[in-house]
Structure formats: structure tokens, C-alpha cells
């Protein structure tokens, strides 16, 4: 790792892990992109294109018709002065103009990585772990300065980027577009990957070739959303899971985002990422500044799996924080699919008794414990215990659960309010709304206005009081609708389009305060399942409920796609009842267990109604998972067979010292007279022998290069899980 500046060539060379990222000051201070890829000693211009006089590409210097910003590979481009591609930023002046011209002013290089004020971001524990470059660009005419921040990590092929706008002039500026990064590739000979989905089928992998024009993944929902995820990748045509070049872009933010690739007339590709400029503006008074969120860029020459492993380790160790970052996560039982709203203290205690018998460690009480919450039509915001259901309160219930040797956890949804609630009747102006318009509801609820400091203060104190009222060690933080009528009664008209981003800043403040007050509590984020599974949430809460769809077969694609970016320690995965409540499928308890044991393991069904056979199998599942939990949650993850490409799925976990591994294989549908097949493993020590429980002892090289035969079985939804241990030689 190093960041170097060569004053003779005016080149910046960032070395991150085994990758190089090179920029150069060009002409009169324009910042050009030169190279990003496998580490090189130096870049002397072997790949530099000749400068040509291109028709309809204007020239900022009329005396040189071979220079146009329209053809320059850039780092943070503007619009309006000869570049017709999508800009990284756009600023409106008081005279209505949106033309700006940023040129190099200065730079500084220093050890470590600064935190972003009020925003989640990756971090370092020691300044030797990374080096940061700040390049200051300025528009002297209007007094605008933009500081581009690049951090290169020593351990990983990781460059993080963000931008800070400062108004050092005398007039008010309005940001219309303020993306976190942009980078131009000299060729568009790539595929691109994004993770589209919907409620119940989040983060499916979609790969397609780049084409001329704009292709994008974005959210305008006020959240990162089920429908898209703040991640894209450029993938070399020949790249697959284990070989080839991949460029990953992941946005550390939980609100509206834009991840865009534009292929221009000359076959170059511009990748841009940041806050979605749709319905966004931000006023910058003289002396004020605006900080964009962070983008984490990963280069891999080891295919998609190489990219994923970098994201996994970085996000697990340098994005997630707190006591649970490195701690094994408990096996839980959640009552939601067992009872929905229809429960009382006796039902929950009975579930806890059975859970203790099975070896489960944590009982989570889901929605319905507060106010008059007998359905989803009332009481959100009234965070007072329903004594009819829980006559001894949360404290009394939690103590009964604790006496059984179990921890107690709780569901909350602090960002929402029901119109039929005491909170709404008292403060109808506390929700997002615009004057004289009806307030649209989703799941019979409205969104609290977290852009307001008084609302955030109220939520911090109210939820803190709840969490302090009982021995609670786990919280599931839910959010069950997206934003409409986005406006705030606390902001003036000219700042209304700041509301969505101010909401996110308020949410991050609330989460930071509450998680800091209760460091002993494991927080799991949720948004109708995986509707806000993003890096921003992981900064405050180290795990996320992956999807409300608990069907084992559906989860193969959901968890496989999620693993493209997010570590296994972040994925909540539960065994639920059959027929499954979301899709009606009936899969065996064995298969449901194997899928759920591929994440943070738990159960979500009425365990008081189990047969003795089911109880015995669950006891075995719980005991087995406890034995492999650290390997699953913190081991190196390899994807082996994609459920998006066929009828099978497989993945494996390998310990850091390669002495132990766990392999999971799944086949969805049976086939008559099916061919025999084998599975090639990954990540083992080629010089080491491994014992596969029940199969024998084999060399790591044989298992990786020749593979292991898959048993022949004739039924739908089958699964196998093999544990490998190195044989002492």
C-alpha cells in the first residue's frame, strides 16, 4: 500500500493490495483517469490513445482541436463545458447557470483513513492499514471547492472514494447532483452485474453485456430497497466465479441511490455511483459544506469469488463495529410465523421451554407486543407494553425466558407510525407529508420524519427506555414501507428536496446513539426482509434479515446473490414451517436446515407442535451448527454451483488455516435416469489430506482438481452437507 505523486509526470499512483489505481493532471488542471487494475510498477503511457480532432466534440481551448473533455477519461467530470456524458456533479448558481469548471488546486497524502461525519463508512483500527489521498479541485469563478477523497487499503485490493463540496464563495449554490465517484474505462468490453429483486426474492444476480447508452440500477423509494441493491460490477467477458477481471462498486448508504454505466459513442464506459439526483437538491450557503457517502471499489483478477471474499472480509472487520463484530451469533427462535399477532405470555414461554429443550439460545418476540397491536392497522409508535398480552411486562417475560437458560430479544419498528395511534394523534406533523395532499399508507402506516431533530430525539429516548426496561440482548429493527409524499413541515420550501437525505442522516444518528447506549445488544436490521440489506446498515447493525421468504428453495438464489457482496455473518437465515407460508412449498427439515445453517442460523415456526422425530432432528441441527458456527460465520466463503445457471447450488466454507471446511450441495428438482455428477471443491490445501465424514480420506488436490462424486438420489429438494477435517500427517 502506498500513495505517491510524481511532480514531473503529475501522476498519482495508489497501490492497494495487489492493485494499482493511477490518475494524472492533464492540460490546465483537469484530473484524468489513467489505469485501474493489477498492480504495476509504473505507468508511462503505453496505452495512451492518440489525441484526435473528433467531430461534434467541442474544445475548451479553441487553439487545440484535438483536446475535448468529451473524449478525456476523467475522475470527477462536469457537464456544460464540452463533455456530453453524464456528470458526477451539477451545481446551480444564483443566475440559473449550471456550468462549472473544476481544476486542480492542491492535494495531500496521509496515513490512515478519516471517518465521514454523520455517515457510515469503512474504517481502520491502525493508521498503517491504509493511506489517504485528498485532491482539491476548485472553480475560482464561483468559489466552489470539491475535495475528492481516495483511501487505499494495504491488505486488500480496495479503494474507497467520496467527495466533499465546500462553498467558499459569496453566493448561494444549489447542488443538483453530487455523486460519490465516477471513473472512465477506456473500453466497454465488459458485462455488468446488478442485484435486482422484489419483496420475497431479493438480490437475484443479473448479468448482461454493456451496450451503447445508459444502463443503471437505482432506487427512488427512500431506501436501498428490495428492487435493487447499491452494488454493480463490471466483469470481463471471460470472467467467472474463480478467474478473470472484476471491478466491484458498493455504496455505503441506505437511501436513494444511482449506480450508472454510460457507454459513449467511442466505446468508453463511465461508471458513476452516489445519491440519486432524482428529486434531490442541497443548498450550500457561503461557508457551508456537503459530504457525500462512500463508495467501496474492489478489483479482482480472481473472478467474482475473489471480489466477494474481499468485500466479505472488509465489511466483516472494517465496516461492522461493536462487540458482536467478531463474536459468534446466537441460534434463535422467532415467534412471528408461529403466532403472528395472536400470542400471549403463556404462548411465548411455552415456545421458550421447547427452545431450551432443543438447545436454542435466544427467543425473539416479534411484532404485536405494544399498544393495541392485534393487527397491522394500529399502534405503531406507541411503544408501551400491551399488558393484556404480557401481564408481567417485557421484564417479567424476559426473566422467565432467562430462567430457562435463554436470552431474550425484541422486534421494533421505530421509523414508522400508525395513523391509528396515540403518537400520530398527538403529532400528526411528525410524518413525511406535503401540504394539502392525502397521506398514502403502506401496511397501514406512515413514515416518521427523521429529518426533524425533535422526532429523532423522541425516538432515541423512547426506544432507549424500552431497551432499558428488560434484560434484552437482541433487537430486530424493522422498516416496512417506502417513502411517498416526501416532504417535511420543518424545512422551508427551498430545502424540501433535501428531505430524503436528511432522513438518512437522522436515521444514522438515531441508530448510532441507540447502539452506542446498548453495546451489549445484538442489533439485526430488517426491512420487510432484505429491503435494506446494504453496507450503510451493517455499520450500525452487524447482521440483516436476508428475506421474509423463508422457503429453502427460494433462499438458494437469495442467499447466493446476497453473498456476492455481503459476508455470511451478516445473513439471517431461519428454518420455517411447511407448507412454507410464502410460496407453499414442502421441503424436508433436513434441506431447510442445510440452507439456514449457511447463514446466521435460527428457527421461525411453532416448535411447540413438533413431532418427536422433528425434535430429535432439530436437536441434531442445533448441536451441529454450534460445532461449525465459527467456520460458517467467519470462514472464507466459496460459491461452487450457481442456482441461477441450473438445477443445483453448492457453496463451501473454509477455515483461515485451511484445516477445516464445510460443503453444502442442493438439487432442486429430480430428473428421471439422471446422469452422475461430481463437485470440484475450492480453497483447500493441495498438499493436505482431508477426511470427509462418512466418505473417506482424500487429498486436497484431488478434491479441488478431480472433484468428489455426488450421491445419486431420486427426489426433489435434496441437500447434503459434508464436513472436512485435515488429517494429521
Curated annotation (Swiss-Prot):
InterPro entries: Aldolase_TIM, Alpga-gal_N_sf, Alpha-glycosidase_related, Glyco_hydro_27/36_CS, Glyco_hydro_36, Glyco_hydro_36_C, Glyco_hydro_36_N, Glyco_hydro_b. Substrate binds at residues 53, 199, 366-367, 443, 476-480, 526, 548. It holds the Pfam family Glyco_hydro_36N. Coiled coil: none annotated. The keyword Cell membrane does not apply. It is an enzyme of class 3 (hydrolase). Has properties that make it suitable for elimination of D-raffinose from low green syrup in sugar manufacturing process from beets in order to improve the yield of sucrose. The active site is at 478 (nucleophile), 548 (proton donor). Not inhibited by D-galactose or sucrose. Inhibited by pharmaceutical drug 1-deoxygalactonojirimycin. It catalyses: Hydrolysis of terminal, non-reducing alpha-D-galactose residues in alpha-D-galactosides, including galactose oligosaccharides, galactomannans and galactolipids. Optimum pH is 6.5. Transmembrane segments: none annotated. Its EC number is 3.2.1.22. Homotetramer. Hydrolyzes the short-chain alpha-galactosaccharides raffinose and stachyose. Belongs to the glycosyl hydrolase 36 family. This is Alpha-galactosidase AgaA. It comes from Geobacillus stearothermophilus.
Amino acid at each position: 500500500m502506498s500513495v505517491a505523486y510524481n511532480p514531473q509526470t503529475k501522476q498519482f499512483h495508489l497501490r492497494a493490495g495487489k492493485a494499482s489505481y493511477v490518475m494524472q493532471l492533464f492540460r490546465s488542471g483537469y484530473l484524468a483517469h489513467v489505469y485501474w487494475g493489477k498492480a504495476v510498477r509504473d505507468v508511462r503511457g503505453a496505452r495512451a490513445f492518440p489525441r484526435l480532432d473528433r467531430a461534434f466534440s467541442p474544445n475548451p481551448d479553441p487553439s487545440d482541436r484535438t483536446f475535448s473533455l468529451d473524449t478525456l477519461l476523467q475522475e470527477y467530470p462536469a457537464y456544460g463545458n464540452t463533455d456530453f456524458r453524464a456528470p458526477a456533479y451539477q451545481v446551480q448558481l444564483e443566475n440559473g447557470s449550471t456550468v462549472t469548471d473544476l481544476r486542480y488546486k492542491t492535494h495531500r497524502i496521509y496515513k490512515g483513513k478519516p471517518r465521514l461525519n454523520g455517515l457510515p463508512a469503512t474504517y481502520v483500527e491502525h493508521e498503517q492499514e491504509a493511506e489517504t489521498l485528498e485532491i482539491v479541485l476548485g472553480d475560482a469563478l464561483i468559489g466552489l471547492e470539491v475535495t475528492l477523497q481516495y483511501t487505499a487499503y494495504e491488505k486488500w485490493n480496495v479503494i474507497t472514494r467520496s467527495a466533499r463540496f465546500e462553498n467558499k464563495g459569496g453566493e448561494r449554490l444549489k447542488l443538483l447532483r453530487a455523486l460519490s465517484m465516477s471513473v472512465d474505462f477506456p473500453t466497454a468490453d465488459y458485462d455488468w452485474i446488478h442485484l435486482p429483486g422484489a419483496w420475497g426474492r431479493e438480490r437475484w444476480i443479473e448479468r448482461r453485456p454493456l451496450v451503447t447508452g445508459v444502463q443503471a440500477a437505482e432506487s427512488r423509494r427512500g431506501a436501498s430497497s428490495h428492487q435493487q441493491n447499491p452494488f454493480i460490477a463490471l466483469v470481463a467477458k471471460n470472467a467467472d466465479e474463480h478467474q478473470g477481471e472484476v471491478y466491484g462498486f458498493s455504496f455505503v448508504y441506505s437511501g436513494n441511490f444511482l449506480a450508472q454505466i454510460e457507454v459513449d459513442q467511442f466505446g468508453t464506459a463511465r461508471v458513476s455511483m452516489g445519491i440519486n439526483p432524482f428529486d434531490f437538491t442541497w443548498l450550500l450557503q457561503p461557508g457551508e459544506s456537503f459530504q457525500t457517502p462512500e463508495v467501496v471499489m474492489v478489483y479482482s483478477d480472481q473472478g467474482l469469488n475473489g471480489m466477494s471474499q474481499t468485500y466479505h472480509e472488509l465489511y466483516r472487520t472494517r465496516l461492522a463495529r461493536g462487540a458482536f463484530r467478531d463474536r459468534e451469533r446466537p441460534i434463535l427462535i422467532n415467534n412471528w410465523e408461529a403466532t403472528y399477532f395472536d400470542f400471549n405470555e403463556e404462548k411465548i414461554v411455552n415456545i421458550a421451554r421447547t427452545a431450551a429443550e432443543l438447545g436454542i439460545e435466544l427467543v425473539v418476540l416479534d411484532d404485536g407486543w405494544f399498544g393495541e397491536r392485534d393487527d397491522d392497522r394500529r399502534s405503531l409508535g406507541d411503544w408501551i407494553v400491551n399488558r393484556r398480552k404480557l401481564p408481567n411486562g417485557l421484564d417479567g417475560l424476559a426473566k422467565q425466558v432467562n430462567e430457562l437458560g435463554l436470552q431474550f430479544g425484541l422486534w421494533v419498528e421505530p421509523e414508522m407510525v400508525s395513523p391509528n395511534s396515540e403518537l400520530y394523534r398527538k403529532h400528526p406533523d411528525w410524518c413525511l407529508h406535503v401540504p394539502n395532499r392525502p397521506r398514502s399508507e403502506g401496511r397501514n402506516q406512515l413514515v416518521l420524519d427523521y429529518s426533524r431533530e425533535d422526532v429523532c430525539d423522541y425516538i432515541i429516548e423512547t426506544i432507549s427506555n424500552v431497551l432499558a426496561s428488560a434484560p434484552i440482548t437482541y433487537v430486530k429493527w424493522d422498516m416496512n414501507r417506502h417513502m411517498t409524499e416526501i416532504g417535511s413541515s420543518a424545512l422551508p420550501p427551498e430545502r424540501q428536496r433535501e428531505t430524503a437525505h436528511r432522513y438518512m442522516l437522522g436515521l444514522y444518528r438515531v441508530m448510532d446513539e441507540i447502539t452506542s447506549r446498548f453495546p451489549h445488544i445484538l442489533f439485526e436490521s430488517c426491512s420487510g426482509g432484505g429491503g435494506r440489506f446494504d453496507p450503510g446498515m451493517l455499520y450500525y447493525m452487524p447482521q440483516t434479515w436476508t428475506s421474509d421468504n423463508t422457503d429453502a428453495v427460494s433462499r438458494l438464489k437469495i442467499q447466493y446473490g446476497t453473498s456476492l457482496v455481503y459476508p455470511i455473518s451478516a445473513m439471517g437465515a431461519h428454518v420455517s414451517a411447511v407448507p412454507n407460508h410464502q410460496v407453499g412449498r414442502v421441503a424436508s427439515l433436513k434441506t431447510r436446515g442445510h440452507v439456514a445453517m449457511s447463514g446466521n442460523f435460527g428457527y421461525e415456526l411453532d416448535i411447540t407442535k413438533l413431532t418427536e422425530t422433528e425434535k430429535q432432528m432439530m436437536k441434531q441441527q442445533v448441536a451441529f451448527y454450534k460445532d461449525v458456527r465459527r467456520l460458517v460465520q467467519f470462514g472464507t466463503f466459496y460459491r461452487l454451483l450457481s442456482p441461477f445457471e441450473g438445477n443445483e447450488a453448492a457453496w463451501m466454507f473454509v477455515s483461515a488455516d485451511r484445516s477445516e471446511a464445510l460443503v453444502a450441495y442442493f438439487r432442486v428438482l429430480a430428473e428421471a435416469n439422471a446422469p452422475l455428477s461430481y463437485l470440484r471443491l475450492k480453497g483447500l490445501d493441495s498438499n493436505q489430506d482431508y477426511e470427509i465424514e462418512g466418505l473417506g480420506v482424500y487429498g486436497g488436490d484431488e478434491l479441488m482438481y478431480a472433484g468428489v462424486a455426488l450421491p445419486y438420489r431420486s427426489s426433489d429438494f435434496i441437500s447434503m452437507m459434508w464436513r472436512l477435517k485435515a488429517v494429521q500427517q
